């Protein structure tokens, strides 16, 4: 059994990105990322801090626009418009979740697709489904990088994706299909989850339920990608997979923490550098 070490791979990617950023700076372009953060959610503040630290490490300029939970949709849209028009900012990230009185879809659709480094804009999602060059959401993109690094061939593989969110499940499906995998996507209404996971060569899960995937639900030699992140009452961080027992049957498995999580942030940086490179081509 091989542990798929996302932490180690993310450091390697960041080292390479730093070189790319240094090269862009010689052309007078410093990649810039703006983050919109609304409210006092501790997890959101922690994630934003991690993203800013990662930006600093590779030389990306980052700025956070913080707003109280009471901000109006109109005020938020006005800020997005200002960032869209700023040539020094190449990527714009809306830290989710947003307060209930804000229409999240409307906000995400207001982001300039060329600055949509989270890959959530319908324009970029459409291009992703068509297999065209675009910004893919960071977590599924990170999973694909893990497959590439460990030389896991996806062609013809039966893959079960558990979770059908717009952020992970649906874009994960698109990336896998584009890599010629046969993809089965499961969700809250799936009747017999184990029937789907048992026949899969690869199981990818990201729903936020500890121990959802147990050893009796997978076959020997399975490859397991655990995107879930859950904090237990004792303070431990665990994924959606019963790691201790499933790892005994798996050929490859990601740990939590240290698996997909670090790759998500690395892909945000990669998308931001890509956006800056696209901008550099336009201003030539």
Curated annotation (Swiss-Prot):
Pathway: One-carbon metabolism; tetrahydrofolate interconversion
UniProt GO BP: L-histidine biosynthetic process; methionine biosynthetic process; purine nucleotide biosynthetic process; tetrahydrofolate interconversion
Family note: Belongs to the tetrahydrofolate dehydrogenase/cyclohydrolase family.
GO molecular function: methenyltetrahydrofolate cyclohydrolase activity; methylenetetrahydrofolate dehydrogenase (NADP+) activity
NCBIfam families named among the record's database cross-references: PRK10792.1, PRK14183.1, PRK14186.1, PRK14191.1
InterPro entries tied to this protein: Aminoacid_DH-like_N_sf, NAD(P)-bd_dom_sf, THF_DH/CycHdrlase, THF_DH/CycHdrlase_cat_dom, THF_DH/CycHdrlase_CS, THF_DH/CycHdrlase_NAD-bd_dom
CDD domains on file: NAD_bind_m-THF_DH_Cyclohyd (cd01080)
Species: Nautilia profundicola (strain ATCC BAA-1463 / DSM 18972 / AmH)
Keywords carried by this UniProt record: Amino-acid biosynthesis, Histidine biosynthesis, Hydrolase, Methionine biosynthesis, Multifunctional enzyme, NADP, One-carbon metabolism, Oxidoreductase, Purine biosynthesis
Protein EC: 1.5.1.5, 3.5.4.9
Catalytic activity, reaction form: (6R)-5,10-methylene-5,6,7,8-tetrahydrofolate + NADP(+) = (6R)-5,10-methenyltetrahydrofolate + NADPH; (6R)-5,10-methenyltetrahydrofolate + H2O = (6R)-10-formyltetrahydrofolate + H(+)
Residues the entry annotates as binding NADP(+): 163-165, 188, 229
Name the UniProt record assigns to this protein: Bifunctional protein FolD
One GO term describing the cellular component: cytosol
Described purpose of this protein according to its UniProt entry: Catalyzes the oxidation of 5,10-methylenetetrahydrofolate to 5,10-methenyltetrahydrofolate and then the hydrolysis of 5,10-methenyltetrahydrofolate to 10-formyltetrahydrofolate.
Subunit structure: Homodimer.
